[in-house]
Regions:
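Generic cytosolic/nucleocytoplasmic N-terminal low-complexity/intrinsically disordered segments
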Residues: 1-2, 178
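Exported/periplasmic ABC-transporter solute-binding proteins
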Residues: 16-41, 49, 54-233
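Hydrophobic anchor at the start of a short beta-strand
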Residues: 46
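Sec-dependent N-terminal signal peptides
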Residues: 3-12
Length: 233
């Protein structure tokens, strides 16, 4: 699955050619893609690359990426030469179960056999899941049950297929796939650090007209409506 993600990033670069390349965490593919499509209709040459933020930052170091949409806290810990941030909204950690399997509270996770989570080192919501497990006092009980996967899209795939009993994802995917899950439980925000999603401007953005248009676009009412629709407010 990781190999497929890397291939998708490479394909975006090849396909993009001289186009502006914007990277984003895989859990934000849907809203960022909608924003990109609106810009394309306006004549802006722009493409997106999507994977967990760890993989995106590796790609960004090659200098081909102009901006990254992701967790500010995560990006600030990287050694990328970030020139500034444009705040988009706030995300949330959500627990979901497959259709047909219902739970009412996170305490019931102790009764489940397998729970998927994004990579704790490379993915935004893997970091937040780890924080939640520690702060809730559930870490010791749930550690043997946890199945780490690349990122939010992979957790969603495991949950929907019924290969796991539950999974931790972001509010964006929870909203986008409404009706495809059994239970949808928003985790108490006091149990993990805030998730502020921003567009980080990289050196390739400076003096780039297309990048300036992208940054301006995410501030427009139509883009704010898109992000709000996918749970970013």
């Amino acid at each position: 699955m990781k190999k497929l993600l890397l291939i998708s990033i490479a394909a975006a670069v090849v396909f993009g050619g001289e186009n502006l390349l914007v990277g984003a965490g895989g859990g934000y593919k849907k809203p960022v893609t909608e924003v990109i499509e609106n810009l394309k209709k306006d004549g802006v040459q722009i493409e997106g690359a999507f994977a967990n933020l760890g993989q995106i930052t590796i790609q960004a170091k090659e200098g081909k990426m102009a901006a990254i949409v992701g967790d500010e806290a995560f990006l600030k810990k990287t050694d990328l030469d970030i020139k500034g941030y444009e705040r988009i909204g706030k995300g949330a950690l959500v627990l979901v179960t497959p259709k047909g399997k219902q739970i009412k509270d996170v305490s019931e996770l102790k009764n489940l056999a397998k729970i998927a989570m994004p990579d704790a080192k490379k993915a935004i919501y893997g970091v937040r899941t780890t924080e939640f497990l520690k702060n809730s006092g559930l870490e010791a009980d749930l550690a043997p049950k946890m199945l780490p996967v690349a990122g939010v899209p992979q957790v969603v795939a495991y949950v929907i297929s019924g290969e796991v009993d539950a999974g931790f994802i972001n509010s964006t995917e929870a909203v986008a796939r409404e009706g495809e899950f059994g239970s949808v439980i928003y985790i108490d925000e006091a149990l993990y650090s805030p998730v502020f999603i921003s567009a980080a401007k990289l050196p390739a953005c400076e003096g780039n007209e297309a990048c300036a248009k992208f940054i301006d676009e995410i501030k427009t009412p139509r883009s704010k409506e898109i992000f709000a629709k996918f749970g970013l407010k």
